Amino acid sequence: MKSTKSLKMEYKKIHLDLLKISKKNNHSSFLNFLKSSPPKQLKEFNGELSVYLSKTIVGQQLSTKAAKTIWERAEKFIIDHPLQNRNLENDLRESGLSQKKCEYVKNILISNTLQKKKNYYKTIGAEEFTNLLISYKGIGPWTVDMAKMFFLGDINILPKGDLGIKKACNNFFPNEDLDSIEEIYKPFNSYLSLNLWDSLD
């Protein structure tokens, strides 16, 4: 495991790499944004994959504020021995989740395959991880990308289906498509994504 100091140096170095890449490719608007912004950190979720996926599903198609409110209500039912909670679906419904989201979350929480230690998912390979996740209802490409970034800590993810990413890329790189941008900023696309999201705030 990397020390706090080495992690701090790593994200600062990546910020410098982004500056170099944007300058080399004449992305002046993005370069100016990077110069005026602090280095972004990619923070891994500290918990089980099933809990991370549940939290992500709770927040789907909701504003950040609404997602936070509902998660704060539902979290205790999801984390505190969900397998022993016979009233889990009812508890989730009362927390504000739709019927479909309740079903999705319950199926994720009762899956033994999603209860393994994080290192297991880091070693099975990206394709197998993707196939595992999308086999569950309620999980699509966007959720897989979020899990790769914020659960596994993959530094090279550009979630091309994300509306915010599309909007920010159109602002900074109006003459280039997402595939081209992804290739240009490889292998630091997750840090590119963090900056793109931040530019919309």
Feature map (PLM): residue ranges:
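Catalytic DNA-binding helix-loop module of base-excision-repair DNA glycosylases/AP lyases
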Residues: 125-169, 191
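Short, charged amphipathic recognition helices of the HTH superfamily
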Residues: 124-127, 175-177
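Intrinsically disordered, low-complexity basic tails/linkers immediately adjacent to helix-turn-helix/homeobox/MYB/SANT
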Residues: 168-176
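N-terminal polyanion-binding entry modules of DNA glycosylases/AP lyases
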Residues: 1-124, 180-201
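Active-site phosphate/pyrophosphate- and oxyanion-stabilizing loops and adjacent acidic/basic residues
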Residues: 56, 131, 167, 179-180
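Hydrophobic/aromatic-lined pockets within catalytic cores
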Residues: 62, 152, 173
